[in-house]
């Protein structure tokens, strides 16, 4: 597709925004979904201080800013900040004029109706896009794995969903949501590191802990066994250098933090773990489709990137499933971006071109048209 008129694909996650052009095989821009505002009054004249910073710039100046995430648990909670992120995406990251490109946005499953309308309204009225579409994240992940039937475990920074899809349609009655994802694991890691005597408290320090989590954490195949190993030897200990040069050592925290995905009770949450929730979702589906779902469990999102997670999932689901059932976990290496990749595939299909909501249709029907045209 010609990038003159290529559609723009934007996957707005709670933690990272992924944006780029339809037809590309990876997003051009990936930056934190953060808006930062200075904590102090600027005193140096001519420094060109801004009243807000977005994405990587907010991240690099985090020491003097208060950082806010406008998307919580996958759902937009602050529209002014969200608009800043979109503005930054179009003009600074992709350097395009939004009025010249169709835009495909992604949304969390079970996104409130009013949110879809607000999204649609901002795109047409603030950014004047010529055409627009909104697609469910988990469905796009399945597309990117080359399937039309499967059950997607999508776990990002803000929310985890289990979405069964049959022949391209999600089965809404069986979609399950867990309000436990990457950000909660980061917070939990902050807590268990403080028990070791390392204190992290500010929004900026949380970002350091997120980095520790991404670099050093893994999922144990057998938690109890791993705890014993950790107690008896220092083989799993790793060191991490903080920005100020101080070096900290991290041991069983490496696998204790991600264990919360399988046992949310350690966070004081009543919900079932990702393994049990996946099983529960399959059991809510028609008995005839279950076999295909068990054989196509697709992982997507950054929080499924922990080493060992697919093996552990395989073990747990196999234990829950009927004994003769073939259980297959698909964990593509690019799963951090599979939602975006699915969007890129969808928006470049010739059959998709008549699916867009055009500016004209929007002007005639208003924001509610999104419910009739986007499934």
Swiss-Prot record:
Keywords per UniProt: Acetylation, ATP-binding, Cytoplasm, Cytoskeleton, Hydrolase, Isopeptide bond, Nucleotide-binding, Ubl conjugation
Entry superkingdom: Eukaryota
GO annotation terms (biological process): ascospore wall assembly; chromatin remodeling; DNA repair; DNA-templated transcription; endocytosis; establishment of cell polarity; mitotic actomyosin contractile ring contraction; protein secretion
InterPro entries reported for this sequence: Actin (IPR004000), Actin/actin-like_CS (IPR020902), Actin_CS (IPR004001), ATPase_NBD (IPR043129)
PROSITE patterns per record: ACTINS_1, ACTINS_2, ACTINS_ACT_LIKE
Protein's UniProt keywords contain Nucleotide-binding: yes
UniProt keyword Amino-acid biosynthesis, yes or no: no
GO molecular function, one term: ATP hydrolysis activity
Subunit and interaction comment: Polymerization of globular actin (G-actin) leads to a structural filament (F-actin) in the form of a two-stranded helix. Treatments with Lantrunculin A, the microbial peptide Chondramide or the microbial metabolite Chivazole F inhibit actin polymerization. Each actin can bind to 4 others. Interacts with YIH1 (via C-terminus); this interaction occurs in a GCN1-independent manner. Component of the INO80 complex. Component of the SWR1 complex. Component of the NuA4 complex.
Designated name of the protein: Actin
Organism lineage string: Eukaryota, Fungi, Dikarya, Ascomycota, Saccharomycotina
Gene coding for it: ACT1
């Amino acid at each position: 597709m010609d990038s003159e008129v290529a559609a723009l694909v934007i996957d707005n996650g709670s933690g990272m925004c992924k944006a780029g052009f339809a037809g590309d095989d990876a997003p051009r821009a990936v930056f934190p979904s953060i808006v930062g505002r200075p904590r102090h009054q600027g005193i140096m004249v001519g420094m060109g201080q801004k009243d807000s910073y977005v994405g990587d710039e907010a991240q690099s100046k985090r020491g003097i800013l208060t950082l806010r995430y406008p998307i919580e648990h996958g759902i937009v909670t602050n529209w002014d900040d969200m608009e800043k992120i979109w503005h930054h995406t179009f003009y600074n990251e992709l350097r395009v004029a939004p009025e010249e490109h169709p835009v495909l946005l992604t949304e969390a499953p079970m996104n409130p109706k009013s949110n879809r309308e607000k999204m649609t309204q901002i795109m047409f009225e603030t950014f004047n896009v010529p055409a627009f579409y909104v697609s469910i994240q988990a469905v796009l992940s399945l597309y990117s794995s080359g399937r039309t039937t499967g059950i997607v475990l999508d776990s990002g920074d803000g929310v985890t969903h289990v979405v069964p899809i049959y022949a391209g349609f999600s089965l809404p009655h069986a979609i399950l949501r867990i309000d436990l994802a990457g950000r909660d694991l980061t917070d939990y890691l902050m807590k268990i590191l403080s028990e070791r005597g390392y204190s992290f408290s500010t929004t900026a320090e949380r970002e350091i802990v997120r980095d520790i989590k991404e670099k050093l954490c893994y999922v144990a195949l057998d938690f109890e066994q791993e705890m014993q190993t950790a107690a008896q030897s220092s083989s799993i200990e790793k060191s991490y250098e903080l920005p100020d040069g101080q070096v900290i050592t991290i041991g069983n925290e490496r696998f204790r933090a991600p264990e919360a995905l399988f046992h949310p009770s350690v966070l004081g949450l009543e919900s079932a773990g990702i393994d049990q929730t996946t099983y529960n979702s399959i059991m809510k589906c028609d008995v005839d489709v279950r076999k295909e779902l068990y054989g196509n469990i697709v992982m997507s999102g950054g929080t499924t990137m922990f080493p060992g997670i697919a093996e552990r999932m395989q073990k747990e689901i196999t234990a829950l499933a009927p004994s003769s059932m073939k259980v297959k976990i698909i964990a593509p290496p690019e799963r951090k971006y599979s939602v975006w990749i699915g969007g890129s595939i969808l928006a470049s299909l010739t059959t998709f071109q008549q699916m867009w909501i055009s500016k004209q249709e929007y002007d005639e029907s208003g924001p509610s048209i999104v419910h009739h045209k986007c499934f």
